[in-house]
Amino acid sequence: MDNQFPSRKGPCFCSFRYVLALFMHFCNIVIIAQRMCLSLTMVAMVNNTNLHGSPNTSAEKRLDNTKNPVYNWSPDVQGIIFSSIFYGAFLIQIPVGYISGIYSIKKLIGFALFLSSLVSIFIPQAAAVGETWIIVCRVVQGITQGTVTTAQHEIWVKWAPPLERGRLTSMSLSGFLLGPFIVLLVTGIICESLGWPMVFYIFGACGCAVCLLWFVLYYDDPKDHPCVSLHEKEYITSSLIQQGSSTRQSLPIKAMIKSLPLWAISFCCFAYLWTYSRLIVYTPTLINSMLHVDIRENGLLSSLPYLFAWICGVIAGHTADFLMSRNMLSLTAIRKLFTAIGLLLPIVFSMCLLYLSSGFYSTITFLILANASSSFCLGGALINALDLAPRYYVFIKGVTTLIGMTGGMTSSTVAGLFLSQDPESSWFKIFLLMSIINVISVIFYLIFAKAEIQDWAKEKQHTRL
């Protein structure tokens, strides 16, 4: 049976925990901006008229424009530069998941964010030295950003009352959805007016400013924070009594491997990032093939799904908490409902995009809905691990994120293979494969998912390897 949480309400939107969630929202916007900006500035950085006539060296660049130096990097080198940040993020997930329960989150996130921002500032200089150095910089950024994105889940183990987990986590994580929309809007303007190096300087400086505020605002334990009212401290502490101490014990690896609810979460994370990556990475390609618009209009249209995904993500978290606070559905039912919506609706709207869209507006509408509806998973499987095992939440998030990233990388590769082999029927094959993966994941989740603390995650357990 689901946990029964205290129904009394504490201070809400004027409370410090919501200030913290909003701050993490902006922090995640900065992180995703630093991650994405190279993909957009690469258009200005590369000499597209001479990709095959010169070797891949940064020394061979146009000297007539010091504000916008241009390099002769082949598409292969560009691909390595693009992917290098994901290798760093991929490698760090499980180590960060483990040490987050041991070391200070304030120091871990703060130093990682500062290093990522510092590297961003030095990327133009690295590009001038050689493509090897920019690859190294991006790997380091992947490691530091992977640290921030995974370790931040530990914040809500101590700061989020059970009845507010959905809205607090969705508020903070939705920064990853709004960030791309902002980046797509401002990066082109900065490149044209100030030069592409200023993109890295600006986002790096923003990261340093956010890092400074982080060290001032955040405390690992709300009980120690001087700006949190006594009433709010008591509310948070009393609401978290049922989950027990958050002190890390030895990891119950065997119990985790045997846990079907954890496997259900893992499958859904794989399906979510498969869907999200396929929809986001290939949205510009799909728009170009269906609407044949110019690149500037394509960029604007491609940014709209991010905006609506952000709106849906925030709505999902608030709605999930509303249903739970009113006892309208059990927590397990809520998690299953939002996961099913987030994985099944993209299938419906993607098929509508292929077979029912007959004009510009219907195509864009179905495209936005297919992207945005996946954000309902923020109220479902994506935060379900916090219900099952608060003590090991960040470690589990590291593992499930690693599994999900595998789905994301595989999705892009498979979609590329389909598009290169059979452009005529490729989109149907891509959507069909996504449908199969999502449906299987939802069925498994509906059968095995739970939302109460598992026996192996309770304080009395001392399961060892």
Curated annotation (Swiss-Prot):
It is found in: Apical cell membrane. Keywords: Cell membrane, Glycoprotein, Ion transport, Membrane, Sodium, Sodium transport, Symport, Transmembrane, Transmembrane helix, Transport. GO terms for cellular component: apical plasma membrane. CDD domains: MFS_SLC17. InterPro entries: MFS, MFS_dom, MFS_Na/Anion_cotransporter, MFS_trans_sf, Pi_cotranspt. GO terms for biological process: monoatomic anion transport; phosphate ion transmembrane transport; sodium ion transport; sodium-dependent phosphate transport; urate transport. The chain crosses the membrane at residues 79-99, 109-129, 171-191, 198-218, 255-275, 304-324, 337-357, 363-383, 399-419, 428-448. It is a multi-pass membrane protein. Belongs to the major facilitator superfamily. Sodium/anion cotransporter family. This is Sodium-dependent phosphate transport protein 1. It comes from Oryctolagus cuniculus. The gene is SLC17A1.
